[in-house]
Amino acid sequence: MAAPEERELSQEQTEKLLQFQDLTGIESMDQCRQTLQQHNWNIEAAVQDRLNEQEGVPSVFNTTPNRPLQVNTADHRVYSYVVSRPQPRGLLGWGYYLIMLPFRITYYTLLDIFRFAVRFIRPDPRSRVTDPVGDVVSFIQLFEEKYGRIHPVFYQGTYSQALNDAKQELRFLLVYLHGEDHQDSDDFCRNTLCIPEVTNFLNSRMLFWACSTNKPEGFRVSQALRENTYPFLAMIMLKDRRMTVVGRLEGLIQPQDLINQLTFIVEANQTYLVSERLEREERNQTQVLRQQQDEAYLASLRADQEKERKKKEKQEQKRREEEEAQLKQMLEERKKRNLEEEKERKSECLPAEPVPDHPDNVKIIFKMPNGTRVERRFLFTQSLSVIHDFLFSLKETPEKFQIVTNFPRRVLPCLPSEEIPVPPTLQEAGLSQSQLLFVQDLTDD
């Protein structure tokens, strides 16, 4: 499988990458980038996780799974390396061995019978795990009190947390089960595990989790891994999508031999991690691509929805404008019809035009707003409202108007008002027998 092409980093990501390298001292730029990507480029989270890793503390950003991760211990491809105790040498050695053999057999037989009988009387208290983190921390404290502080970085968390972090970070996890009652445990811890070469090797290549089988958490792990003797080491990694035991080391192993055996296990199984890392990167890129496609689809959908919304708004606005135009036209037509009916009613109510030789005749010439002239006779005794009604009844007369004399210019009070409740007669208004009046349009005022 070819490695997918790495995406180019933005300027902000490049700055975070360099800052993370300065803070952590990691020389590999690829490792820095991978760590930041695992934390979504959150530099504070990545630095804190790196510090936790150096101290063996589980990641505070990786929550513990609700169910413990299952470990495949039945893989037939598990590499097993057992160190047998050295055979007796010489006549004296064999003699001592043969003399002590019956006592050893008797001791271990009686011990097994005693433990078996005790289980019927009182259940093994180690079977109840109440504080797994406390069990691990307590073992680490006792280990440092007995063997000093020069040792591999212990993972300060539960076995399940260690499995989860190893799975998430695609790293090897070395599990050490400490048998306090075994005769080789003290020698292994003092002369193998705490040797600087071994310590540096483990710290740089894998996570390291350890606990005593006398602790409930260690006993629980012991029941799962089923060791045969002590010291016991198990190498666990993500293989075929499962956390799998790929190596078992049992017995008192020497420092260089331990490094060689672990190196062999790592190199034999490194391809699985590389393959899983490539698949994970491919899945991440596929997920990113799918997310980008989803975002593009949502953006397109929102654009279409916005376009449809604007279209509906435009249609709704057009519909309202058409309705308003229709309503306005209907009101104008009704107003026009009412005006025509009012003009017709005023025309029917007008008194008849007096004969030309009537002594009270007043001949008035009206100059209309459109420039035309209208002539009619009225009586001096008639009210100015008659003049107004006559002009109102004409088709060319605007809806609102006023009547003005020429000289001196004054507006004739043809309609009732608060000052003049009853309009005066033509004579009272001072009109002469032959009069020119102007009709002014007030429609726009």
UniProtKB/Swiss-Prot annotation:
UniProt xrefs under SMART domains: UAS
Location in the cell: Cytoplasm; Lipid droplet; Endoplasmic reticulum
Domain UBX: 357-439
Cytoplasm listed as a keyword: yes
Coiled-coil segments on the chain, per record: 275-353
Domain of life: Eukaryota
Keywords recorded for this protein, A-Z: Coiled coil, Cytoplasm, Endoplasmic reticulum, Lipid droplet
Protein's GO biological process: stress granule disassembly
Biased composition (Basic and acidic residues): 303-348
A GO term from the CC aspect: endoplasmic reticulum
Pfam families, per database record: FAF1, UBA_8, UBX
Keyword DNA-binding: no
Function noted in UniProt: Plays an important role in endoplasmic reticulum-associated degradation (ERAD) that mediates ubiquitin-dependent degradation of misfolded endoplasmic reticulum proteins. Involved in inhibition of lipid droplet degradation. Involved in stress granule disassembly.
Protein name per Swiss-Prot or TrEMBL: FAS-associated factor 2
Gene that encodes the chain: faf2
